[in-house]
Amino acid sequence: MNQRNASMTVIGAGSYGTALAITLARNGHEVVLWGHDPEHIATLERDRCNAAFLPDVPFPDTLHLESDLATALAASRNILVVVPSHVFGEVLRQIKPLMRPDARLVWATKGLEAETGRLLQDVAREALGDQIPLAVISGPTFAKELAAGLPTAISLASTDQTFADDLQQLLHCGKSFRVYSNPDFIGVQLGGAVKNVIAIGAGMSDGIGFGANARTALITRGLAEMSRLGAALGAEPATFMGMAGLGDLVLTCTDNQSRNRRFGMMLGQGMDVQSAQEKIGQVVEGYRNTKEVRELAHRFGVEMPITEEIYQVLYCGKNAREAALTLLGRARKDERSSH
């Protein structure tokens, strides 16, 4: 591979970053995958697979491993960031001085900025300035299924139409990976954060043993909370009926591949928060997202009762069953009401 002709540099060699890199390479593109741990990257290069997360998926020949950040960023103008939301800003500040002058950045990170609850677009603009084209991809994607080439669909939104068109062409594969463009940059970002919170609630409900009726009601009312918050931020309502909204919400709330759902199930079964996190053994994005989404809702005056009760369980020591009973005991409402 020529040093500067890769189609994409992927920042983040976890399960999802690796799966996206594999998908791009499988589409015939030269891809560079960077990870912060040189030993981990050396192991990936030796094994030609990510044995820790995706042991049965060999790397295509066009997937190249790199532990030197400057070299990775020099390889392509297109940068795909796939890191946990709580380090998103830190990573962007790290890569900014090393990016090519023609660089364009897209992220698959789902969540909001830690502590502030800001959208990641605001974090990116603060870190990178106003000139770099930005984009986000989001939707119902489990890394193992994506890497295995099973049919998957996502949404793509960008501040730059040319970048959006180029990304759609790069990522889209008619055999297994559909990429839908969406002009709603805010909505596509927000859906991925809120669904993590609701998935914890769905897991709690199932952990308690409330059954399918309760789970479905929680998903539906969770979608209403997502839509209300989105409207307050200026998102398009239709976005939340698409891949980045309802699609990702249903997937994360109903399948045990979801760490957020499994985490919630443990809480519903009586496990404490710290023990549940330790048992999951990987980042549970919804834990931080709950605090951030709640902060955002308060800032914009949006009532989100499910989010509030999940927050009470995660951060205030409330029992999951008590939280569920609080929700069930709320005053009668019109289903179409704003609270």
Curated annotation (Swiss-Prot):
It comes from the Bacteria. It is an enzyme of class 1 (oxidoreductase). Pathway: Membrane lipid metabolism; glycerophospholipid metabolism. Its main location: cytoplasm. GO terms for molecular function: glycerol-3-phosphate dehydrogenase [NAD(P)+] activity; NAD binding. NADPH binds at residues 15-16, 36, 110, 143, 259, 283, 285. It is found in: Cytoplasm. Sn-glycerol 3-phosphate binds at residues 110, 139, 141, 195, 248, 258-260. Keywords: Cytoplasm, Lipid biosynthesis, Lipid metabolism, NAD, NADP, Nucleotide-binding, Oxidoreductase, Phospholipid biosynthesis, Phospholipid metabolism. It catalyses: sn-glycerol 3-phosphate + NAD(+) = dihydroxyacetone phosphate + NADH + H(+); sn-glycerol 3-phosphate + NADP(+) = dihydroxyacetone phosphate + NADPH + H(+). Signal peptide: none annotated. Pfam families: NAD_Gly3P_dh_C (PF07479), NAD_Gly3P_dh_N (PF01210). InterPro entries: 6-PGluconate_DH-like_C_sf, 6PGD_dom2, G3P_DH_NAD-dep, G3P_DH_NAD-dep_C, G3P_DH_NAD-dep_N, NAD(P)-bd_dom_sf. GO terms for cellular component: cytosol. GO terms for biological process: carbohydrate metabolic process; glycerol-3-phosphate biosynthetic process; glycerol-3-phosphate catabolic process; glycerophospholipid biosynthetic process. Its EC number is 1.1.1.94. The active site is at residue 195. The keyword Transport does not apply. Catalyzes the reduction of the glycolytic intermediate dihydroxyacetone phosphate (DHAP) to sn-glycerol 3-phosphate (G3P), the key precursor for phospholipid synthesis. Belongs to the NAD-dependent glycerol-3-phosphate dehydrogenase family. This is Glycerol-3-phosphate dehydrogenase [NAD(P)+].
